[in-house]
Amino acid sequence: MKNLVILPTYNESKNIVKTINLVLAQRDDLNILIIDDNSPDGTAKIVKDLNNEKIFIIERESKKGLGSAYVEGFSWSLKNNYQKIIQMDADLSHDPKEINPMLSLLESNDLVIG
């Protein structure tokens, strides 16, 4: 099963490594898609320097906003055959520990919001 966590970013250099590590620690079948809105603080470079095959990045040329980042992420995930898609904020306002319970609920539901 291919599961994807979409993390839009803008100036998340102080949070992004911790967020990625916490997300990937939840389960082995997770990949992460970072959608960076041209963060001037170097967020995209930090992500690329991790050089992790479970992490993908879309670098956008300008700040296009959270909503369009999620739309682009959903489109990318469907093109890449992910079965389950999780959206989270990169600032840890969403607790990565909730990923497993949410994925379990998706076994018997089409949509889980938490």
Descriptions of predicted regions:
Residues 12-25:
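Short, well-formed alpha-helical segments that are part of the catalytic scaffolds
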Residues 82-93:
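Short beta-strand-to-loop acidic/aromatic patch adjacent to the donor-nucleotide binding site
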Residues 44-80:
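Conserved donor nucleotide-binding strand/loop of the catalytic core
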Residues 36-45, 92:
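A conserved acidic beta->alpha catalytic loop
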